Amino acid sequence: MKRFLFLLLTISLLVMVQIQTGVTSQNATSQSSPSASSNLSGGGFLFFVANAIIHLFYFS
């Protein structure tokens, strides 16, 4: 049961990171949109937080 919850948490956090960074959304970029580096830094931060939470739950 613990492994199933870990897998469910991992999948949901990865989907959340993809939605947040716009990987799954099909939005067209305009000239006034922020650069890709700012978008990637937000995704990198969310990935780090998700990874830390996953390890805390898995090793507890």
From Swiss-Prot:
Subcellular location field: Cell membrane
One Pfam family assigned to this protein is CD52
Q: Which keywords does this chain's UniProt record carry?
A: Cell membrane, Glycoprotein, GPI-anchor, Lipoprotein, Membrane, Signal
Positions where lipid (GPI-anchor amidated serine) attaches: 35
Q: Which GO terms describe its biological process?
A: positive regulation of cytosolic calcium ion concentration
Q: Does the keyword Cell membrane apply?
A: yes
Q: Does the keyword Transmembrane apply?
A: no
Propeptide at 36-60
User: Which Gene Ontology cellular-component terms appear in the entry?
Assistant: plasma membrane; side of membrane; sperm midpiece
Q: Which residues are glycosylated?
A: 27, 39
Q: Where is the signal peptide, in residue numbers? A: 1-24
Membrane topology is:
Lipid-anchor; GPI-anchor
Summarize the protein's role: May play a role in carrying and orienting carbohydrate, as well as having a more specific role.
Q: Per its UniProt record, what PANTHER family does this chain match?
A: CAMPATH-1 ANTIGEN (PTHR15029:SF0)
Question: What's the protein called, per UniProt?
Answer: CAMPATH-1 antigen
Q: Quick one: which gene encodes this?
A: CD52
